Amino acid sequence: MAAATVEIDESNGAGETVTHNITNSNMGSTDAVNLDPVAYPLAPGANTYIKYQKIHVTNIGTSSKIDNLKVWRTGALGVGGTHAHITNARLTSYAGAKAYATPVNTTPVATCDQVMPSSVPATANLGIGGSLTGALTAAGYSDYLGHQITTDASATAGSTSTMNYQYDETA
């Protein structure tokens, strides 16, 4: 059995430039893929630029289906002040496939009004084809995951979090 080949892709810029198989999900004060947070730090009271990412099945292999997409964050967002990691990922009342728009650092970005889970969600929270019950049976993409970090003026720098992406693969 050959497992499916899966990568995380990110879209940036006006007109949407897609980068395949990104190396990190770092967030900061500019719209950039594989961002260096030291070069683009987030000032207290500011918001990161929204990230638009997709789970991309580049080859289904001998699998019959990829589904049950789950995304969450582990690790603290920092000390002092109020921080929020907001997203369009949700367990219920899914708003359907999010359309790409030039990334901004203002909030709220349409449909990114949920708190990013900090543990594995019980069920899918990112859709395929506009539905949380969607599935890929050939090479293809998830819906966009939109996510962004917001802070207040009392926030202090220096946090590290990890984005987690999980899916079910059926033989």
Question: Residue locations for each model-derived region?
Answer:
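Long, small/polar-residue-biased beta-strand-and-loop interaction regions
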Residues: M1-A171
